[in-house]
Structures are given as structure tokens and as C-alpha cells.
From Swiss-Prot:
It comes from Dictyostelium discoideum. It is a single-pass membrane protein. Its main location: membrane. May be involved in protein transport between endoplasmic reticulum and Golgi apparatus. Belongs to the YOS1 family. This is Protein transport protein yos1. GO terms for cellular component: COPII-coated ER to Golgi transport vesicle; endoplasmic reticulum membrane; Golgi membrane. One of its GO terms (biological process) is protein transport.
Amino acid sequence: MIMLSFMGFLQSCLLIVNSFAILNERFLNKIGWGVKSDLDMNSFKGKIITLLHSLRFFFRSMFSNI
């Protein structure tokens, strides 16, 4: 029972990260989550933005062959 709830939690986290990863770059720039040269990469926000852009690159490269 505990494993099922933990797996549900992991799946929901993956779905949330995936939903942010498919967002358009213009939308992310409007809300201040675009990649900027003055972004502090050691902050929590900087790490999340880097993760989102890495996921977007990964999913685009993975599905570009289809």
C-alpha cells in the first residue's frame, strides 16, 4: 500500500515536470522563467529553469526521429 502511494506521487511529479517542459519559450519568458545570461544557476529557481530547458531539449530530440 505504501509503495502504491509513493508510485502515485512519483507519477504526479513526473506529469507536472512534463507539463512545464512542453511549455512554449515565449510563455516562459513572459512569466520570467526564460533562460537569461544573468540567471543565478545556484538558486532554486535557476536550477528549476535549467531542468525545464534540459527536459524540453531531451523530449524534442527524442521525438524528432518519429
